[in-house]
Amino acid sequence: MKFLDQAKVYIRSGNGGAGAISFRREKFIEFGGPDGGDGGRGGDVWALVVDGLNTLIDYRYQQHFRAKTGGHGKGRNMTGQKGDDIILKVPVGTQIFEEDNTTLICDLTEVGQRYRLAKGGNGGFGNLHFTTSTNRAPRRANPGLSGEERTLWLRLKLIADAGIIGLPNAGKSTFLASVTAAKPKVADYPFTTLYPHLGVARIDAREFVLADIPGLIEGAHEGVGIGDRFLGHVERCRVLFHLISAQEEDVVKAYQIVRNELKAYGNNLNDKTEIIALSQIDTLTIEERKAKQEFLQKVTGKSVMMFSAVSREGLENLLRAGAHIIEMARKKDVVREEQD
């Protein structure tokens, strides 16, 4: 399935149905009086979070959505039928914005959650409503009110416990494929990953969702390369696996490029908990990898792990470190919810 994380849609709720002009007609009753019913309310436009979706690709092919008009009122004081609603099915993690693409309307984070984006117009009054002491047989009814019309942006921010970040060819896709059932494209050239991949990692009876974020390069936050488009997916992650290829000549520079991009992007990405790991260590001697690890630790002041997705050396320890941080974050969320 193709990946699309942003889409523009045009929606319109249904117009209300018109009220009826009708008079009671029964045998032996000469002046039955008005009995025109009200029009039905127009259909609403809803956004609904459904399971099994992880892309907005459907909205590339259909952008216009219009709910049905309410039914017209009828005689015998019968109200018109409500117009059918339109439901926009979206993945977990979808945010909906106004036409300016900056004003947030709603953030949909749970399956089954729904939000009314446009309310249908009210139905018009039938002539029964216009009876007065001086006009017992009004020939007047209201048309229904118009529905709402809006232009909206849908933006998907994948919900993953952990994000995998790093420069192109840092081994992110290989890491994801080695610890989950995901099958991202893996090749020896930059930007192999053109959109995020999700997978579920399991370690010691614990599991968490991993997202492989396409490679960042210097200037990504300004639109260079493809990384800036997907930095938003990092926002929801509890921890970041920051991978640096052990084959890099300057591992510190490789680390700092990505850190600078996170900081420049904003939205507190730079404050995310990270696990730094040298990848592809199977390509170096023990002395070479150790030297790069110690140098990186000295400059950053942080612990640096090492692993190889090919030989699986250090892989389980890396997963355990991530699972522990995620577990602690989940417990904090539970406590926070109980306090609220």
UniProtKB/Swiss-Prot annotation:
UniProt-annotated binding residues for GTP: 166-173, 191-195, 212-215, 279-282, 308-310
Localisation: Cytoplasm
Principal subcellular localisation of the protein: cytoplasm
Coiled-coil regions listed in the entry: none
Annotated residues for binding of Mg(2+): 173, 193
Biological role: An essential GTPase which binds GTP, GDP and possibly (p)ppGpp with moderate affinity, with high nucleotide exchange rates and a fairly low GTP hydrolysis rate. Plays a role in control of the cell cycle, stress response, ribosome biogenesis and in those bacteria that undergo differentiation, in morphogenesis control.
GO molecular-function terms, A-Z: GTP binding; GTPase activity; magnesium ion binding
Family: Belongs to the TRAFAC class OBG-HflX-like GTPase superfamily. OBG GTPase family.
Domain OBG-type G: start-end pairs: 160-327
Enzyme class: hydrolase
Gene Ontology process terms (BP): ribosome biogenesis
Named cofactor requirement(s): Mg(2+)
InterPro entries hit by this protein: G_OBG, GTP-bd, GTP-bd_Obg/CgtA, GTP1-OBG_CS, GTP1_OBG_dom, GTP1_OBG_dom_sf, OBG_GTPase, P-loop_NTPase
Quaternary data: Monomer.
Domain Obg residue range list: 1-159
Protein name, entry field: GTPase Obg
UniProt keyword list: Cytoplasm, GTP-binding, Hydrolase, Magnesium, Metal-binding, Nucleotide-binding
Any one Gene Ontology cellular component term annotated for this protein: cytoplasm
PROSITE patterns: G_OBG (PS51710), GTP1_OBG (PS00905), OBG (PS51883)
Enzyme Commission code: 3.6.5.-
PANTHER family assigned: DEVELOPMENTALLY REGULATED GTP-BINDING PROTEIN-RELATED (PTHR11702), MITOCHONDRIAL RIBOSOME-ASSOCIATED GTPASE 2 (PTHR11702:SF31)
Keyword Hydrolase: yes
